[in-house]
């Protein structure tokens, strides 16, 4: 049987590398859990048991082994398989899994509601240190839930190298491999002793030794059982252990040591690069050449600012490389703080730095800043602290799909008191926004960065907070564009002119505050006003202008051209923008319908 499973693992690993090389995706963690997932499939019943992953980065093999093997080559493509687990995709997917820390809390709910079913949670070693996970562990131990099996996949990485005390705990447990055998021998010896007084003395000794040997003694004292597999890519080791713990009652934790990138030499050598990777050449491991991104522009500029001002600190929640901070981190390691997957903690830490006279920059993806709204309000806004927020991946992100799109942050930042919000429309404006941020002390400042290649305009005027810029001057129709939408509306400018839609185009990087002077004094020239943004339409930039119109008695038709849906699927960014009628011919048709009141 083991030879068959080994062959199966080889076939899955080959298929995985081929598909991800074409579509991009999360390769390293999935290569590491091939044997673990195959063995879980062998021992447990995926149809009857409830299997959860935290996070879904490591669930590709699970998709293949359930009901999606024939469609696996469509993963991350439009209308193909989702990049993460999705209950809308398969009955085997019990819970969505885009963000870290959700599986253990959800498992508690499943375990309570389904006492006769086994709930198996595969948790990454970075996710286990997340606050949600620790809260769930606290409850599981307190209630001694009998039907939960927690498998901690320790590959010593999240996206980059793991940080934090709990990660060090895991390393200590994994390295103390002889502990389990020692403990079993001690228990066996104690059980053979008849004298109660001697037995109690030895039991106290065993507990004392355990407190020194395993850092998880506190959890073990709450009723958890701990087991280790130190060769997590070895079927001969995995199968017997899973059989042993399958029917145990009470909360159980199995620590499995796997190798991220296992079986593909380039992924083994550069684990961070192959965590999440764009399409690449299998023979060389090299990705195909891409255009310069806004994240790169930010990374270069923040390094420059860091050299000028030693009070600048950068913070990221396990996303140093993704947010463009790797150069800053190398140059100023003592001023670049990686907090791990702990967004709320990151924001409050930054507030403490700001309160102490430092200049903190919280660099984080839009989808993850959602996890820190309480801290944004309570710790930053109410105290009006000058914390700078660099919100990367704002707008549609593409292949990572609905759990990762950055289409909510603008709405809640507009709602929170004291925040200034900038959405640069060009690479030059991004640099200017960062230059302004260095000495900005009026309160918290947000600078939003899209997942897009850079765009610039010749002879562009400098960025000013509270002031917009006229890019094209025309008549009848006014287009106010923020962020990426300036590039998009300029792409169709000539076609609009040719169709008789004459217009003025405004670059509006300053979203909060608005350019009230322009709105009060120049709006009356136009028959139609369009506000273009890559954000969910509710409580949007356009809504803020609409409210300003209402408050100031301005009676002009205002059309909000934004994302109509709050849940955008996965696919290429260009495809999704066109589907949302925010690009190209579909945008032109949308504008015509709004002007003429009918479909043309």
From Swiss-Prot:
Pfam families the UniProt entry points to: DXP_synthase_N (PF13292), Transket_pyr (PF02779), Transketolase_C (PF02780)
Cofactors demanded by this protein: Mg(2+); thiamine diphosphate
Record field: transmembrane: none
Annotated gene: dxs
Residues binding Mg(2+): 125, 155
Protein name: 1-deoxy-D-xylulose-5-phosphate synthase
Catalytic activity: D-glyceraldehyde 3-phosphate + pyruvate + H(+) = 1-deoxy-D-xylulose 5-phosphate + CO2
A biological-process GO annotation: 1-deoxy-D-xylulose 5-phosphate biosynthetic process
NCBIfam families, sorted: dxs, PRK05444.2-2
GO molecular function annotation: 1-deoxy-D-xylulose-5-phosphate synthase activity; magnesium ion binding; thiamine pyrophosphate binding
Presence of keyword Transferase: yes
EC assignment: 2.2.1.7
Subunit annotation: Homodimer.
Family: Belongs to the transketolase family. DXPS subfamily.
UniProt remark on cofactor binding: Binds 1 Mg(2+) ion per subunit. Binds 1 thiamine pyrophosphate per subunit.
Xref: Gene3D superfamilies: 3.40.50.920, 3.40.50.970
Residues reported in the UniProt entry to bind thiamine diphosphate: 57, 98-100, 126-127, 155, 264, 343
Cellular component terms per the entry's GO annotation: cytosol
Keyword Metal-binding annotated: yes
């Amino acid at each position: 049987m083991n030879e068959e499973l080994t062959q199966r693992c080889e076939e899955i690993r080959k298929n995985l590398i081929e598909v991800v090389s074409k579509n991009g995706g999360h390769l390293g963690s999935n290569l590491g859990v091939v044997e673990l997932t195959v063995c879980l499939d062998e021992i447990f019943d995926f149809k009857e048991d409830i299997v959860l992953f935290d996070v879904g980065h490591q669930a590709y093999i699970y998709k293949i082994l359930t009901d999606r093997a024939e469609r696996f080559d469509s993963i991350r493509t439009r209308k193909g398989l989702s990049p993460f687990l999705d209950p809308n995709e398969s009955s085997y997917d019990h819970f969505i899994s885009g963000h870290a820390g959700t599986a253990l809390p959800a498992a508690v709910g499943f375990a309570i509601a389904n006492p006769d079913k086994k709930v198996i949670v595969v948790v990454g070693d970075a996710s286990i240190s997340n606050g949600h996970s620790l809260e769930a562990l606290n409850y599981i131990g307190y209630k001694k839930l009998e039907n939960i099996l927690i498998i901690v996949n320790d590959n010593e990485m999240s996206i980059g190298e793991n940080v934090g005390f709990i990660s060090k705990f895991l390393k200590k447990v994994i390295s103390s491999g002889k502990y389990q055998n020692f403990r079993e021998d001690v228990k066996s010896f104690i059980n053979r002793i008849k004298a109660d007084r001697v037995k109690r003395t030895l039991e106290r000794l065993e507990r004392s030794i355990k407190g020194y040997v395993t850092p998880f003694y506190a959890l073990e004292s709450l009723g958890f059982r701990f087991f280790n597999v130190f060769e997590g890519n070895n079927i001969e080791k995995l199968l017997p252990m899973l059989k042993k713990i399958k029917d145990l009652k009470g909360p159980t934790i199995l620590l499995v040591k796997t190798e991220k990138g296992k079986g593909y030499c380039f992924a083994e050598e550069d684990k961070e690069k192959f965590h999440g990777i764009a399409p690449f050449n299998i023979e060389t491991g090299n990705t195909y050449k891409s255009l310069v991104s806004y994240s790169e522009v930010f990374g270069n500029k923040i390094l420059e600012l860091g050299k000028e001002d030693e009070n600048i600190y950068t913070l990221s929640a396990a996303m140093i490389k993704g947010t463009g901070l790797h150069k800053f981190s190398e140059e100023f390691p003592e001023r670049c703080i990686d907090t791990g997957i702990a967004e709320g903690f990151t924001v409050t830490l930054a507030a403490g730095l700001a309160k102490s006279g430092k200049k903190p920059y919280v660099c984080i993806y839009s989808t993850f800043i959602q996890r820190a709204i309480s801290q944004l309000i309570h710790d930053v806004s109410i105290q009006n602290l000058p914390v700078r927020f660099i919100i990367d991946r704002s707008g549609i992100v593409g292949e990572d799909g609905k759990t990762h799109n950055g289409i909510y942050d603008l709405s809640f930042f507009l709602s929170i008191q004291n925040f200034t919000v900038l959405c640069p429309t060009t690479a030059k404006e991004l640099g200017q926004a960062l230059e302004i941020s260095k000495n900005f002390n009026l309160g918290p400042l947000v600078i939003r960065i899209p997942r897009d290649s850079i765009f610039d305009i010749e002879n562009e005027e400098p960025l000013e907070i509270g002031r917009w810029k006229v890019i094209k001057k025309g008549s009848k129709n006014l287009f106010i564009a923020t962020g990426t939408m300036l590039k998009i509306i300029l792409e169709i400018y000539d076609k609009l002119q040719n169709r008789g839609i004459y217009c003025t185009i405004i670059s509006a990087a300053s979203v909060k505050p608005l350019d009230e002077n322009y709105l009060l004094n120049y709006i009356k020239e136009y028959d139609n006003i369009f506000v273009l943004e890559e954000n969910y339409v509710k409580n949007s930039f356009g809504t803020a202008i609409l409210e300003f119109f209402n408050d100031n008695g301005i009676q002009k038709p205002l059309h909000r051209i934004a994302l109509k849906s709050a849940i955008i699927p996965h696919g290429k960014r260009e495809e999704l923008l066109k589907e949302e009628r925010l690009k190209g011919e579909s945008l032109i048709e949308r504008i015509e319908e709004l002007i003429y009141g009918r479909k043309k």
